Amino acid sequence: MSIENNIIKSLLEIKAIEVRKDKEKWFTWTSGIKSPIYCDNRLTISYPKVRNEIALSFKELIDTNFKDVQVIAGTATAGIPHAAWVSSLMNLPMVYVRNSSKQHGKTNQIEGLITKGSNVVIIEDLISTGKSSINVARCLREHGVNVLGIVAIFSYNLEIAKDAFMQENIKLFSLSNYDELINYMNEINQLNNNENQLLIDWRNGLNNK
């Protein structure tokens, strides 16, 4: 079984992925997008086997694609635990980046020690529109850091995100994605024809806007 399918299998087993057929009960993302599917990767931290599998897969992905990495950065809040586990596996320093600066104390947006010119890989739990991840990358770049790329547990493979990452010249890799999810759910007979078409049409609708 591929890494993608292994991750998807684990996410389904812990019920991190939920599909709702009834349009009136669809999920609402932070961006305002209505979605028949929700991927709650925060649940992975409660399952040692799953989080270890994710950490090892991240390490392999980073070793393969970002050989010059010097620091692992987690996105607040969902990327923080995974960044901690990966940085420990790779024996690398770690930082995490808030959505905005604190309003008290040192008012830091980046927590942890990082120096200008450092090569950083950002760890994110989920990529939808890509907006929050790109904001983190911009923050790091503003502090003189070299962002090698972003790795995520799951990506919806939305065109709006692909375009945004391309415009920012940011490389993105994910351990699993929407297309692989649909394929795997069909393989294990978790989707009927109507559900399969619903998921395809929803994503196509977003990509064609």
Swiss-Prot record:
It catalyses: orotidine 5'-phosphate + diphosphate = orotate + 5-phospho-alpha-D-ribose 1-diphosphate. Homodimer. Belongs to the purine/pyrimidine phosphoribosyltransferase family. PyrE subfamily. Keywords: Glycosyltransferase, Magnesium, Pyrimidine biosynthesis, Transferase. 5-phospho-alpha-D-ribose 1-diphosphate binds at residues 98, 102, 104, 124-132. Its cofactor is Mg(2+). GO terms for molecular function: magnesium ion binding; orotate phosphoribosyltransferase activity. CDD domains: PRTases_typeI. Gene3D superfamilies: 3.40.50.2020. Pathway: Pyrimidine metabolism; UMP biosynthesis via de novo pathway; UMP from orotate: step 1/2. Its EC number is 2.4.2.10. GO terms for biological process: 'de novo' UMP biosynthetic process; pyrimidine nucleobase biosynthetic process. This is Orotate phosphoribosyltransferase. Catalyzes the transfer of a ribosyl phosphate group from 5-phosphoribose 1-diphosphate to orotate, leading to the formation of orotidine monophosphate (OMP). Pfam families: Pribosyltran (PF00156). Orotate binds at residue 128. Signal peptide: none annotated. It comes from Malacoplasma penetrans (strain HF-2). It is an enzyme of class 2 (transferase).
